[in-house]
A protein has these predicted regions:
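Conserved alpha/beta-hydrolase
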Residues: 45, 49-71
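The serine-hydrolase catalytic nucleophile loop
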Residues: 37-49, 206
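Alpha/beta-hydrolase fold nucleophile elbow
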Residues: 97-109
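Glycine-rich nucleophile elbow surrounding the catalytic serine of serine-hydrolase chemistry
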Residues: 107-117
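N-terminal cap/lid segment of alpha/beta-hydrolase-fold proteins
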Residues: 1-25
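Catalytic nucleophile-loop/oxyanion-hole region of alpha/beta-hydrolase
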Residues: 67-97
Length: 258
């Protein structure tokens, strides 16, 4: 069963979508975080939520400000509002399903970037949790320039940049400055599975490999032929299988994935 609602907390209005297991109270909660220009109805989120529903798991997804069904405007999109949205959703999930014994995170691209920026506060709330990062935008400033189709910073300072897919966002240089001064390349001391396409047109593969080396508890699975959106036949099924196995294993055996 899927349920929609909007969380209101201070200056935040956060559309959420919950996927409930059909026959169980659910002992596991999965927080799903979409990418830049995407939304909570992502095909990856939907497929993994459906699969994990067979394994006693509640999934909760949400829209960042200025994304999807969010009533917030592009001028309200910032790293601060994105991180606070994620943390608010986590607080809501923990209060809604107090019986949960385990927490997991699925985060794609920009969503992975925001998750890593907020990792310390997430640990404070959920303890050690299992995390799957799909095509993480570790240096989001570089990804943003590719999405904006410009490397002319001077031009960006003069005007606003239109980004997005189904919903367009008009963003100023101030947002890019936030991205420039915040990158997620650090040792986060967390077990994590990184799913990365080797033909990704947005992510610098050298950044991903360096991040894997820096994070000794991480595991990188490189998907041959996959682009950033993993939209070739069979790739979605592969992601679902790998994520499910990672979430369900009692102990994270990295050697099985390397």
């Amino acid at each position: 069963m899927d349920q929609h609602t909007v969380l209101t907390y201070g200056d935040l209005q956060i559309p959420i979508l919950t996927h409930e297991p059909d026959y169980s109270s659910g002992s596991r909660v999965l927080i799903a975080v979409h990418g830049f220009g995407g939304n909570m109805h992502s095909s990856v989120i939907g497929a993994i939520a459906e699969e994990m529903g067979f394994y006693n798991t509640h999934t909760i997804a949400f829209d960042f400000p200025a994304h999807g069904e969010s009533p917030m405007h592009a001028r309200e999109l910032s790293l601060d509002t994105c991180q606070r949205s994620l943390l608010t959703v986590v607080d809501y999930a923990m209060a809604r399903w107090p019986q949960a014994k385990e927490y997991c995170v699925l985060a794609s691209s920009f969503g992975a970037y925001i998750t890593l920026l907020a990792i310390d506060e997430l640990k404070e709330r959920m303890g050690r949790f299992k995390m799957v990062l799909r095509c993480p935008a570790l240096r989001m400033n570089k990804v943003f320039l590719k999405l904006a189709r410009t490397d002319d910073v001077g031009l960006m300072k003069k005007g606003r940049i239109i980004c997005g897919y189904e919903r367009k966002m008009e963003l100023g240089y101030d947002f890019f400055e936030q991205l420039q001064t915040n990158n997620a390349v650090a040792d986060h001391d967390m077990p994590m599975l990184i799913l990365q396409g080797d033909q990704d047109e947005l992510i610098d593969l050298e950044d991903v490999e360096f991040f894997r080396i820096l994070n000794g508890k991480s595991c990188l699975v490189m998907i041959p032929g996959a682009s950033h959106r993993f939209n070739h036949e069979g790739e979605l099924d592969m992601i679902v299988d790998l994520a499910r196995d990672w979430y369900l294993c009692e102990e994270v055996l990295l050697c099985e994935y390397r």
